[in-house]
């Protein structure tokens, strides 16, 4: 399949690129991509309650009983095991519900079993959950077709755009034979551009950001102090705390932190920090894993690491490894189950113990929930480093550029 092509431009440059693409290929061959919004657990309850004339106060109370965890499914709230494993994972295991969440789910189930209007609302909401509620336009996706799009797929006009909008969503659109690219407008690039102009104006210096050293002491001191306000990707309070503990001293540390600081992998940040400073033993399930995991102190952080390990341990081809990467990224359980058998048999042939392989695969399945690619993390860490470099060496000009692009008085 085609690679996933994401490109970032400064805010002003993005529209120029889109105009160029339209001019090169023709308006009939370029379109934006539709998005379909579906009814989630809480919204389905509120929508059904409104139609069935359940008072707003009762509707809100009903919706509040649904836990706030992202991805919560009403169907599982109403029917899945609460805390004991009974063939399928319980709400406590899979969703990670806390005792308070479980108590609310129990109340929800009691109402569901009743025969009043609230019960009727829950039954209808369960049936409608996942239905398409509205449409929108993908924030960055652009389609380029080899011929007139109307001959390939249904399209529509959009209220706020001169481009057509596809009626097939992005996850499957390439199967229609078109190229999908993401053109993102990134304010950070505009900030860098303005900062460089101010530095030239004030100091008579022209800086080429592609040539700045990646081991600059002043920049890493800024990271180690956690003084990263207004720098790209590293400005949150939580990240600043981790930076002060980590004390990064090489670019690879920034790449890893950029990948780890997200829901899911954040749990591994304390281990990453302790291992970097030698306060926690670095362990490898198999000795051959050290070569690939040593940069991240034995913790699997990137999709590329899994790809390389599957080739090294089980003799996967590059093609097999890429299928594994995609299955992890898209959480395709059926594909992962097939690849597990291939992985275990291939690794056993290479002399690795089956019980250890089971653990490795289980860890990878958990990793699949937050799998991140190193190439993306590297690009963003590089951009982040450029902002930190300018802040460390030219704080006045850099912060002026940040304020110029703040967009609102509240942000300033």
Each model region followed by its residue ranges:
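Noncatalytic, beta-rich nucleic-acid-contacting surfaces in large DNA/RNA-processing enzymes
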Residues: 1-412
